[in-house]
């Protein structure tokens, strides 16, 4: 899971660095392609770029191309050497010597390139250190310098100007002391670092890869730092992280102090210039109005009072800032002491709990072992008793089974007797509903009274037309009623048994009085 998160972070960092690189390269190209290319600096850059491209082409021709040619030659030579193993070994030795020679050349070239890379990195590091030292030296010099705006400004009152400059010196000395305290604090923290300068650079690069809003950022970069520094324990890395946080906090406080000094210096210069301009204006008014000396003195006193008031305000402000910073430092120290005490107490409580836990576990294991042994003995006794009971139950079940078989035989015999009795009753019922009426086809084919009444008033011709074309041989009412199937169904309906299972079984079994002719049987449902 951590490897997947590392891969995602590496991919994002690679995309970000690639974008920054493309942006810088485009800016450099656009800068080089401007009209100011004729200047000496840009000409040197163009010449340096040309030299780099020529060196790269020479490196490809001298190192990379021979290796590629040797590789392709080995790929072609290997199958032929495998297919013809009976040849002399001189070719193989020559090939191995050539490969060793190319390896030595490439190794020497790579060592030379690594040496040049190391020298370039050292030069860049020295240059960056010089630039940082120069910038860090400039800021204290700026603190010690007097503002040229106040020095060059003419003031008719030297005492006022000297007091303002002295106040500025006192003001800058307080900030200088605070800045020196922060520098000493930074040096003290830097001396406690657990990693070397190169390892610290790697540490900072790893931390910069993981953005601050990433979930689980600390676990990820600690895991990656342990991979980069396997010789360092997690405790050393955590300690270095703590000192780095303190170092960054102190640097941020130092930056805030310098920003406050710049802002206060600007405000002081503005107020001092306003005061001096007011003094100049007052002096001009006094020179024009010589009689109004008293007013000038009052104005000077007022201005001095303002300066002293502003000085008191600045002293109060610096005192409050020092108290706030001291309280913050004390609060941080108290928090760290409290955290250490809590950690020690927590560890002691954890050890006590672990001992109690193992003692309870040992006691529980012994009790469980005793209980299991007792339970094993009880189970053995119960199994012996149960085996005796099981044998008795098997014997009892066998007797019950024999008894049930005898009962089933009796029930089967009784059912057979009941079935015979039912057949006898049904046979008696069949005899009761048997056909007893003789067939009368003449009556069946004769005219009815209704037909006679209908055809009595008509002519003979109409009567002839209404006669059937042929005689229909069918059944009369007596024959239909005499059918045993109909009579059996009517009897069942009267008894309310026409929907029972008995009626469904018996109706298909009853046949007509005369069997049907074979030529009248339908073969539709037999196909």
From Swiss-Prot:
Q: Which organism is it from?
A: Mus musculus
Chain segments annotated as coiled-coil in the UniProt record:
289-353, 401-438
Q: Which PANTHER family match?
A: COILED-COIL DOMAIN-CONTAINING PROTEIN 148, MUTATED IN BLADDER CANCER 1
Which branch of life, at top level? Eukaryota
UniProtKB keywords: Coiled coil
Q: Which residues form the signal peptide?
A: none
Name by which UniProt lists this protein: Coiled-coil domain-containing protein 148
Extract the InterPro entries matched here: CCDC148/CCDC112
């Amino acid at each position: 899971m951590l490897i997947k998160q590392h891969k995602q972070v590496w991919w994002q960092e690679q995309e970000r660095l690639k974008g920054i690189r493309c942006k810088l390269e485009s800016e450099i190209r656009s800068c080089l392609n401007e009209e100011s290319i004729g200047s000496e600096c840009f000409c040197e850059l163009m010449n340096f770029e040309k030299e780099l491209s020529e060196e790269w082409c020479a490196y490809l021709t001298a190192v990379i191309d021979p290796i590629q040619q040797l590789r392709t030659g080995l790929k072609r030579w290997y199958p032929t050497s495998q297919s013809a193993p009976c040849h002399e070994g001189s070719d193989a030795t020559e090939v191995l010597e050539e490969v060793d020679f190319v390896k030595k050349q490439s190794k020497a070239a790579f060592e030379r390139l690594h040496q040049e890379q190391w020298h370039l990195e050292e030069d860049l590091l020295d240059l960056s250190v010089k630039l940082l030292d120069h910038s860090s030296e400039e800021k204290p010099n700026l603190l010690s310098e007097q503002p040229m705006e106040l020095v060059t400004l003419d003031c008719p009152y030297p005492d006022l100007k000297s007091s303002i400059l002295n106040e500025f010196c006192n003001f800058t000395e307080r900030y200088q002391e605070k800045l020196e305290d922060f520098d000493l604090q930074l040096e003290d923290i830097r001396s406690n670092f657990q990693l070397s300068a190169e390892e610290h650079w790697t540490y900072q690069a790893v931390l910069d890869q993981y953005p601050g809003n990433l979930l689980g950022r600390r676990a990820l970069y600690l895991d990656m730092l342990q991979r980069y520094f396997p010789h360092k324990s997690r405790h050393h890395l955590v300690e270095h992280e703590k000192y780095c946080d303190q170092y960054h906090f102190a640097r941020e406080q130092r930056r805030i102090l310098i920003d406050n000094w710049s802002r206060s210096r600007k405000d002081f210069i503005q107020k001092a210039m306003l005061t001096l301009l007011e003094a100049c204006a007052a002096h001009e008014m006094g020179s024009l109005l010589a009689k109004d000396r008293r007013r000038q003195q009052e104005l000077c006193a007022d201005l001095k009072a303002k300066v002293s008031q502003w000085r008191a305000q600045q002293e109060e402000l610096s005192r409050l800032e020092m108290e706030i910073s001291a309280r913050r430092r004390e609060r941080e120290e108290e928090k760290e002491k409290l955290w250490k005490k809590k950690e020690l107490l927590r560890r002691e409580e954890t050890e006590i709990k672990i001992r109690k836990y193992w003692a309870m576990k040992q006691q529980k294991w012994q009790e469980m072992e005793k209980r299991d042994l007792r339970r094993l003995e009880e189970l053995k006794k119960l199994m012996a008793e149960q085996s005796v009971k099981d044998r008795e139950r098997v014997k009892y079940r066998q007797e019950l089974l024999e008894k049930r078989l005898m009962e089933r035989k009796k029930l089967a015999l009784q059912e057979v007797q009941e079935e015979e009795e039912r057949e006898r009753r049904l046979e008696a019922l069949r005899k009761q509903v048997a056909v007893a009426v003789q067939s009368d086809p003449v009556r069946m084919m004769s005219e009815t009274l209704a037909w006679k009444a209908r055809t009595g008033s008509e002519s003979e011709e109409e009567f002839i037309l209404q006669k059937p074309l042929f005689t229909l041989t069918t059944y009369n009412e007596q024959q239909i009623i005499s059918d045993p199937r109909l009579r059996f169904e009517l009897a069942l309906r009267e008894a309310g048994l026409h929907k029972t299972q008995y009626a469904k079984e018996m109706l298909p079994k009853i046949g007509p009085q005369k069997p049907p002719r074979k030529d009248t049987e339908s073969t539709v449902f037999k196909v």
